[in-house]
Design a protein with these regions (language model features):
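Non-catalytic, solvent-exposed segments at the cell envelope interface
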Residues: 1-312
Length: 312
């Protein structure tokens, strides 16, 4: 399950901006941080959720596949289940996060690894399983080789179908959302076009609009999960039925049997108390596009919070 962090130490007087925290990767052993010992929770289940910027169904892979046209992942989340305390955490990752991206040519030959926005990694692939596997590898490496146990990628066509299948999704808005003519504080049930615009829209002439969209995505995802959870209480096969409604727009390495098992497990989890996180950092303007740079110290603290348990 990957390698685990070596010791990281930070004394009381250090500022979080200093670079003298040794970078860690997953290995057997405990982590010393700010005077406490932490142990990686090996029982965590972590799944990568990708939202792919395409209205088309998942493409078939054949001899004509162009491995430069896998499609960008506009939404990137980790969904984690902690069986020790029955909590769910969702970690949002900014699409513009600058990290090592493996480039391939149209015939799927490896070209080189470059620093670029995380969202493009899915594009260097077949738009199917290979794209997902490459995105999963890149996200794992960004988070110090964090073990990821499965992936689900959803194209925009899946969003329409799933949103309608659950009867629309009710959200409360923390800020004005002009694209659906709603203001801060409103509680609305999103159907059809409104759900699409709510999730997809961002102002291209407004700096850092991707992070505002990410906040909307987090609100929607939490509300959607809650509704699915309520329906699953009444019908344990509900998540599998949802998957089947939208399966031509979804790529996943989670089998139907595994979905059923996870659904039954989740009934014992605290769905009201889902913890929402974002990989910390800041957006700056690059030469052409916005670039999001991770704050490594805050990232470590978040990883310890979600994936580790204090042992002293």
């Amino acid at each position: 399950a990957g390698e685990m962090p070596d010791e990281t130490e930070q004394s009381e007087g250090e500022t979080s901006g200093q670079e003298n925290d040794s970078v860690y990767v997953y290995q057997e052993g405990d982590v010393n941080y700010n005077g406490h010992m932490y142990r990686y929770n090996k029982d965590m289940l972590t799944f990568l959720i990708l939202g792919i910027d395409s209205n088309d169904p998942v493409p078939e892979v054949n001899e004509n596949t162009n491995y430069l046209k896998g499609g960008q992942s506009d939404a990137i989340f980790l969904f984690t289940m902690n069986p020790h305390d029955k909590t769910i955490s969702v970690v949002a990752v900014d699409r513009n996060t600058m990290t090592d991206i493996d480039m391939y040519d149209k015939d799927n030959n490896y070209v080189k690894t470059v620093k670029a926005q995380l969202c493009v990694q899915h594009g260097y692939g077949d738009g199917n399983e290979l794209s997902c596997e490459r995105a999963e590898k890149t996200v794992s490496e960004l988070l110090y080789n964090l073990p990821i146990h499965g992936y689900v990628s959803m194209r925009l066509g899946a969003i329409w179908r799933l949103n309608e299948a659950v009867g629309g999704v009710e959200v409360t808005l923390p800020f004005d959302v002009p694209e659906i003519n709603q203001s801060a504080g409103a509680t609305v049930r999103l159907y059809g076009q409104d759900a699409f615009y709510f999730l997809k829209y961002r102002s291209l002439d407004k700096f850092n609009s991707a992070s505002e969209r990410l906040e909307k995505d987090k609100i929607y995802l939490k509300a959607f999960m809650k509704q699915v959870f309520e329906s699953t209480k009444a019908d344990i096969s509900y998540p599998v039925k949802l998957y089947q409604i939208a399966s031509s727009y979804i790529v996943t390495d989670i089998s139907v049997d595994e979905m059923s098992y996870l659904a039954s497990e989740l009934l014992g989890y605290d769905i009201e108390g889902v913890k929402m996180y974002s990989v910390p950092g800041e957006t700056v303007m690059g030469e052409k596009f916005e670039e999001f740079y991770v704050n490594e110290v805050q990232l470590k603290e978040m990883l310890l919070d979600v994936f580790y348990e204090k042992v002293d």
